[in-house]
A protein has these predicted regions:
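Short acidic, S/G/P-rich loop/turn micro-motifs used as interaction or catalytic elements
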Residues: 11-13, 61-64, 92-93
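N-terminal beta1-alpha1 ligand-phosphate binding loop
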Residues: 1-25
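Short hydrophobic segments within beta-strands
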Residues: 6-8, 57, 87
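Catalytic beta-strand/loop module used to bind and position nucleotide/cofactor moieties
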Residues: 68-106
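Structured adenosyl-cofactor binding patch, chiefly the S-adenosyl-L-methionine
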Residues: 91-133
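S-adenosyl-L-methionine/SAH cofactor-binding core of RNA-modifying enzymes
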Residues: 28-84
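Conserved strand-to-helix beginnings and helix N-cap segments that scaffold or border functional pockets
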Residues: 16-20, 66-70, 112
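Conserved RecA-like P-loop NTPase ATPase core
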Residues: 5, 55, 115
Length: 133
């Protein structure tokens, strides 16, 4: 699975960047993942592939469990989807699914860290590998 994580803005906190890099490294055994930070919605839309299954992440999306996200990723893979895009944005965009990490506001760096961790957790669940709750 090819996964691209898009967001408008910059991750400034070094600790959050290190955590994202660590999850990126761990995810390498399961998928190809890339974080793409852009300046605005127009740049994001130019970079977004029209063949990707788009999951918008915002505070107004549906709350999912880790198991629910794992099932979503697994189902997409089994049904032939090879490209996924997570877009962290409150902007109005077209999407295939709309999820929330939390109903609370958080910094971009925190949201990206949590999203990468949840994708990693999802793959551990899919492969029946231990992961603490």
């Amino acid at each position: 699975m090819n996964i691209k994580v898009y967001a408008i803005g910059m991750v400034k906190d070094k600790n959050q960047l290190e955590a994202i890099k660590e999850y990126d490294k761990r995810l390498g055994r399961y998928c190809k993942i890339e974080m793409i930070l852009v300046k605005n919605k127009e740049v994001l839309l130019k970079k977004l592939s029209n063949k990707s299954y788009v999951i918008k992440i915002s505070t107004t999306g549906e709350l999912f469990t880790s198991e629910g996200l794992a099932e979503k990723v697994k189902t997409l893979g089994v049904t032939g989807t090879s490209d996924m895009a997570f877009i962290y944005s409150e902007e109005h965009l077209e999407w295939d699914d709309h999820l929330a990490l939390s109903k609370m506001d958080m910094s971009l760096g925190m949201a990206m860290t949590i999203l990468f961790e949840q994708i990693y957790r999802g793959y551990r669940i899919i492969h029946n590998q231990a992961y603490h709750k």
